[in-house]
Amino acid sequence: MYEQAIVIRNDLKMGKGKMAAQACHASLQAFLHAQKISSSAVSGWMNEGQKKVVLKVNSEKELLEIFKNVNIEGLPCSLIRDAGRTQIEPGSLTAVGIGPEKEEKISKVTKDLKLL
């Protein structure tokens, strides 16, 4: 089974719409990266219904640790930096998108995170 994980910073106190927008940015950018490096995972994910899971971290440090570990594992990913036009400071890191990839590969990095 394939999935995509989106990890959102919960400490920024973004509104629901802002969080949704950041999750969408992370999802799309990670998908585009996956198309370049793992087309078989993208095909599998598309055929299985595009499962997504949205998780949370409580700091920029935690978000960067996840991003580092995702890169160590060689998974397709994205790191989202907000432009700062609405609710949060310009340049704030808001989200990481991971995959699509096999669930067991993603869970190696995300297994300790809680659902948003």
Swiss-Prot record:
The keyword Cytoplasm applies. GO terms for cellular component: cytosol. Its EC number is 3.1.1.29. InterPro entries: Pep_tRNA_hydro_II_dom_sf, Pept_tRNA_hydro_arch, PTH2. Keywords: Cytoplasm, Hydrolase. Its main location: cytoplasm. Disulfide bonds: none annotated. One of its GO terms (biological process) is translation. One of its GO terms (molecular function) is peptidyl-tRNA hydrolase activity. It is found in: Cytoplasm. It is an enzyme of class 3 (hydrolase). CDD domains: PTH2. It catalyses: an N-acyl-L-alpha-aminoacyl-tRNA + H2O = an N-acyl-L-amino acid + a tRNA + H(+). The natural substrate for this enzyme may be peptidyl-tRNAs which drop off the ribosome during protein synthesis. Belongs to the PTH2 family. PANTHER family: PEPTIDYL-TRNA HYDROLASE 2 (PTHR12649), PEPTIDYL-TRNA HYDROLASE 2, MITOCHONDRIAL (PTHR12649:SF11). NCBIfam families: arch_pth2, PRK04322.1. This is Peptidyl-tRNA hydrolase. It comes from Methanococcus maripaludis (strain C6 / ATCC BAA-1332). The gene is pth.
